[in-house]
Design a protein with these regions (language model features):
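Membrane-anchoring alpha-helices and their flanking helix-loop junctions
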Residues: 1-85, 99-157
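Active-site His/Glu-centered metal-binding helix of metallohydrolases
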Residues: 96
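Conserved SAM-binding loop
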Residues: 92-93
């Protein structure tokens, strides 16, 4: 729980923007992968068994990471603000974002959609911006403890 006078730690319109980027990704991925087939010609060079295995690995790993990150932050009632730097937050400073992008990567690999990969690059840049903004706010709030965490744990992987 943050003090009442503490500025919002999320970037403005972060939630709505995430929904917009996810929608764009899914529309492009589904349209290209199942209807238009404009940029999926590379799928013929990668056996479906390999694409399916990678899809399974990326989506399960990303989904698990995102879920565990969500549970670590929102699944526990806290009386005071706490720097969560253990569990999946000991592997990545932004495991929820990383989990979402890993699931998206699994979808891209499953159909080899270049168009969806380009959108995923945009999603990454967006999440990189969000992470930078949030880290600036977290350094303001937690100070040297968060700076030490940043030195110890990478932003992504």
């Amino acid at each position: 729980m943050l003090p009442e006078d503490y500025e919002e730690s999320e970037a403005p319109y972060a939630d709505a923007s995430q929904a917009v980027f996810a929608t764009i990704f899914f529309v492009v991925w589904e349209s290209d992968s199942f209807w238009l087939h404009v940029t999926t010609s590379y799928s013929q060079y990668i056996p479906s068994s390999i694409r399916n295995a990678l899809f399974l690995v990326f989506t399960v790993a990303g989904g698990y990471m995102g879920w565990m990150a969500h549970e670590q932050i929102f699944g526990v009632a806290r009386e005071e603000a706490e720097l969560v730097d253990y569990g999946v937050y000991g592997l990545s400073r932004h495991p929820m974002y990383l989990g979402i992008m890993t699931v998206f990567l699994g979808l891209v690999v499953s159909t080899a959609s270049v168009a969806a990969m380009v959108v995923l690059l945009g999603v990454f840049l967006f999440y990189h911006y969000l992470a930078s903004y949030e880290e600036m706010k977290l350094v303001e709030f937690f100070g040297d403890r968060y700076v030490a965490y940043m030195a110890r744990v990478r932003r992504w992987v």
